[in-house]
Design a protein with these regions (language model features):
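Peripheral, non-AAA+ core regions of ATP-driven protein-machinery
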Residues: 1-213, 220-223, 326, 466, ...
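Walker B catalytic acidic pair
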Residues: 295, 301-302, 313
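P-loop NTPase nucleotide-binding/switch module
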Residues: 166-204, 208, 235-290
Length: 503
């Protein structure tokens, strides 16, 4: 019996799979066991054709392949290559395989290797578990080299790998992928005329990682402003890039030529999105939009039009930064630390409160429209910002609005303050402060205490709202470079908690 080391995926985490191949006498047969899915079972035909087309002899024996551990379901086509190598080694077409080496890849009938998904998390697991060499399809090699302390070989076809293993034509290891400066041309805040108050709110949101709800009539610029928010966010750290790339690798969204995700994600699902497409899951659990927005922005336009059950899936991730998917076979936890940015009209016709008086909705219809969004979800959105219609004078003004670069410089300065504040704590911005941290970093003077108490009683705030206001006030103080939260910082934070929308 021969065992070939390979790897598998459980959510976005890797684990080792032992591909055991046993050749015995009896009628020729080829069985794959160890809880394989349909794609793994189909490997029998791909492997047989690839062996014959690379010039090797397919054994006339009873072949049994076991994928261990058998308790975990094996999915996908990545086991084609280790199954082929196990058969060739068991039939003495190959000598012993290299120690501390793992193999994965899909085969074509001609013996060419095709790329597979989830290579980065598997490579990271391999590097941690003592595997020193990893053989992957050529198109996956750059992604695999993102894992440190691992020698990666990009394999073009079975013939090339067989010659390498026989020491006839040694392959050169893949060069570690080096990131290059990629200037992503994002829409600029300078494109938006007027709306200075809304831009200020978005600057605060970007500086502290706060969630935002934009409410305004059609054409007021809600979507335009939201799509320019990425241009004022700080760059991702290397750790954040690796976390996001792992998720994108599992989802099959990485670029073979530039595998590392270096720009913050901006995900904007349509309002017909299902709960599974948002939260992730399915028969074979995969990351949803919530996880694909990790370290970036999840933008929900026309918020009340989303299915209520889909919106309710946001509640746990907004609090915990992870989404837990439970299935019969077990539970799966995926990272989902994102900024939620939502946009909505104030009523079904969209013109409630507009100076033109064009709204045709009754008060009852307006209230019913607002009730589509649950109070608990709205309570988790830090900032409720009204986006007024743009005035003609603002449209025709000759002065150039502030560019994203200018706003981003202020955001970066505030983030540096937060980075120093939370050094060694494990969070990156004010929005993620725990209640204990709020008590430590959000002290109020007597005037601030009176202001906060008055707002709490008058507005009927919840404990969660209270904490979110203090987090926002801390961010506003950071933007001004102030160590203390002054009453004017607190007053500005309080104004972003709309009560009318919660009625």
């Amino acid at each position: 019996m021969v065992t070939v080391r390979s790897l598998g995926l459980n959510g976005i985490g890797g684990y080792e799979v032992g591909v055991e191949c046993f050749l015995s006498g009896g009628l020729p047969a080829f069985d794959v066991v160890g809880l394989p899915d349909a794609a793994v079972r189909e490997a029998r035909d791909r492997v047989r054709a690839a062996i014959k087309n690379c010039g090797a002899k397919f054994p006339v024996s009873r072949i049994t392949v076991n994928l261990a551990p058998a308790r975990l379901r094996k999915e996908g086509t990545l086991y084609d290559l280790p199954i082929l190598l196990g058969i060739l080694t068991a039939s003495d077409e190959l000598k012993a395989l290299p120690e501390n080496a793992a193999f994965l890849g899909e085969l074509s009938l001609s013996g060419q290797l095709r790329p597979v998904t989830g290579v980065l998390p598997m490579a990271l697991y391999a590097a941690r578990s003592g595997i020193r060499e990893l053989y992957v399809p050529e198109e996956n090699a750059a992604e695999a080299t993102l894992a440190e302390n691992l020698t990666v070989y990009g394999v073009r076809d079975v013939g090339q790998l067989v010659r390498h293993l026989r020491r006839e034509e040694p392959m050169a290891p893949a060069e570690p992928w080096q990131p290059t400066r990629q200037d992503l041309h994002l829409p600029d805040m300078a494109d938006v005329m007027g709306q200075e108050n809304v831009k200020r709110a978005l600057e605060i949101a970007a500086a502290g990682g706060h969630n935002v709800l934009l409410i305004g009539s059609p054409g007021s610029g809600k979507s335009m402003l939201a799509r320019r928010l990425p241009s004022i966010l700080p760059d991702m750290t290397h750790e954040e890039s690796m976390q996001t790339t792992e998720i994108y690798s599992v989802a099959g969204l990485t670029d073979a030529r530039s595998p590392l995700v270096t720009h913050r994600p901006f995900r904007s699902p349509h309002h017909t999105a299902s709960p599974v497409s948002l939260a992730g899951g399915g028969t074979v659990p995969r990351p949803g939009e919530i996880s694909l927005a990790h370290n970036g922005i999840l933008f929900l336009d026309e918020l009340p039009e989303f299915d209520k059950s889909a919106l309710e899936t946001l509640r746990q991730p907004l609090e915990d930064g992870v989404v837990t998917i439970t299935r019969a076979a077990g539970s799966l936890t995926l990272p989902s630390r994102f900024m939620l940015v939502c946009a909505m009209n104030p009523c079904r016709c969209g013109w409630y409160g507009h100076p033109s008086g064009r709204c045709t909705c009754s008060e009852a219809q307006v209230e019913n429209y607002m009730r589509r969004i649950s109070g608990p979800l709205l309570d988790r959105i830090d900032m409720h910002v009204e986006v007024p219609s743009v005035e003609y004078d603002a449209m025709r003004r000759r002065t150039q609005p502030e560019s994203s670069a200018v706003i981003r410089a202020r955001v970066n300065a505030a983030r540096e303050i937060q980075k120093a504040r939370f050094s060694g704590i494990g969070i990156s911005c004010n929005a993620y402060m725990t209640p204990a941290m709020i008590g430590q970093f959000c002290d109020l003077d007597p005037a601030g205490e009176r202001l906060m108490q008055g707002a709490f009683d008058r507005m009927g705030l919840t404990g969660r709202s209270h904490d979110r206001i203090l987090r926002m006030a801390r961010t506003i103080a950071d933007l001004e470079g102030s160590e203390a939260i002054r009453p004017d910082h607190l007053a500005e934070a309080i104004q972003y908690r709309s009560t009318s929308i919660l009625k």
